Amino acid sequence: MSMNRRRLLLRHEYNKYIHFEDKEVERICIEKWDKDGDGKLSKEEAAQVTNIGNMQMPHNCKFREFKDFENATNAVQFHFPDTNVEIVVPSQITTIPIFFAQFVTAQIQQNNNAEGNAVLIFLGEIKEFQYYAISDDREYRTPYFSIVLPNTKTPPRFNPAWKANYGICKKMYVPDGSVELYKAANVPGVLNILPISEYKGNY
């Protein structure tokens, strides 16, 4: 077998699987959805997942690979134990339901005045954030999350209590040409609406 042929086969094998940045998230996903028991999660296995259900996420969670679950619906509730979170939501999810992201945490309770760093990236053209889409379990009054909407040019509908009663979105990144539309929409509970070109992270 030629070296180039071998490289192509290795690359093909590598590309069959989802490669998680966060090893604890990887463990959780393999435990839930590794059907063939090979200790890895293939893209084919991820594509078979529709109902994510309740997921208890680890501390300092990064779940960018959620974007690879291309058939997952919005039947999901993420429970985060702190506000050091980054998650990339796949493009087919366009309505963000009640309790989509729940910050129910000992750390938040102990550090109620500390500003959090949760980043929720929604790749779809979002239509609606429903009641308590983002929620926490106490009067956490400081800004603790940012929303990134790279493909939502028209402001979605925001339920007046989309981020619970106390949550504060410190930054909402939107398409550059839509900043003024979002500002005119008077989205409740958002401190800063910024152009996506100023977002420094990856998605």
Predicted regions and their residues:
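Enriched but not universal
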Residues: 1-14
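Disulfide-bonded cysteine-rich modules in secreted/extracellular proteins
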Residues: 14-28
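Structural signature of tandem-repeat unit edges
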Residues: 15-16, 58-98, 104-128, 138-156, ...
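Acidic glycine-/aspartate-rich tracts in secreted/extracellular proteins
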Residues: 34-36, 177-180
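Acidic, glycine-anchored loop motifs typical of Ca2+
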Residues: 34-45
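Amphipathic alpha-helical segments that form the core helices of the histone-fold
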Residues: 46-60
